[in-house]
Amino acid sequence: MAKLSQNWKKLSSKIQDKPKNGSVKKPTLKGKISKKVKASISEKLSTTNNTTTTTTTTTSTTDVVPIASSTKPTATPLEYTLWTQNHTINVSHIPKTPKPLPLSRNDSRKLDPGKYVAIDCEFVGIGKDGEESALARISIINYYGVVLLDTYVRPQERVTDWRTWVSGIQSYHMQDAIDFKTAQLKTMELINNKILVGHAVNNDLDILFLSHPKSMIRDTCKFPKFREIAGGKSPSLKKLIKHFIQVDIQIGQHSSVEDARATMLLFRLFKREIEQSMRNRNKRQ
């Protein structure tokens, strides 16, 4: 199960020795993900005919965000593919431009968190010249690309570089941001007992001071077939999506939702090979 990392435990003990406002205390894992919206979601899906929507709303809850709730009429190629292709990803069926998202009453099961979730975070700079990183946005999506969590996170230290050119984050986004402790707890709730998919996912876990069982991590950065594209080095997500999907992402400012969907799509595209690679690695250890 997901748990606090040793680094977090050490940091937490130090902070507790200094009772200042805004100090971080060790969160406890309690309760389960709320499903209070599921009935209303199913109702929306059952009354929706050929409605074209995507999820862009930022939420600070762990409730599933229904795709049918947004007013945007089309879905991105990544979102459309994750939602419409149930099992094996067929690259030839991936649209190159935004496309209407079909919905039916049979789609309600896709709104559940499920077995697999993908995570991506955006960072801002703290410390001298903004050289250190702090969490400022976190997004978690399920197997079908549905947003489970997408929220801005208020850094615990003063931000010295918003890195807006790449993160897309500006100071006004912090007005509705949640605190770090809450973000950490919500993440723990969502990834607990799940297969966690990510690109260089340890960076996201480290920034959250969380750990996750290695056997339940699927890091697209480490898959041999993907590393071949970068000459044996760690490949960029942008390069992998362009190579295998022929779709451009990260044009200008990044979106952690888009990056999480891109990572899940890559995982699903090579799911069988990635799982076999994991089994082989476990045998060698």
From Swiss-Prot:
Residues annotated as domain Exonuclease: 116-267
Region described as Disordered: 1-35
InterPro entries for the chain: Exonuclease_RNaseT/DNA_pol3, REX4_DEDDh_dom, REXO1/3/4-like, RNaseH-like_sf, RNaseH_sf
Record bears the keyword Transferase: no
Enzyme Commission code(s) on record: 3.1.-.-
Annotated keywords: Exonuclease, Hydrolase, Nuclease, Nucleus, rRNA processing
Keyword check for RNA-binding: no
Bias (Polar residues) ranges: 1-14
Localization, UniProt: Nucleus
Coiled coil: none
One GO CC term, this protein: nucleus
Main location: nucleus
Function field: Exoribonuclease involved in ribosome biosynthesis. Involved in the processing of ITS1, the internal transcribed spacer localized between the 18S and 5.8S rRNAs.
PANTHER family cross-referenced by the UniProt entry: RNA EXONUCLEASE 4, RNA EXONUCLEASE REXO1 / RECO3 FAMILY MEMBER-RELATED
Family to which this protein belongs: Belongs to the REXO4 family.
Protein name: RNA exonuclease 4
Species name: Candida albicans (strain SC5314 / ATCC MYA-2876) (Yeast)
Gene that produces this protein: REX4
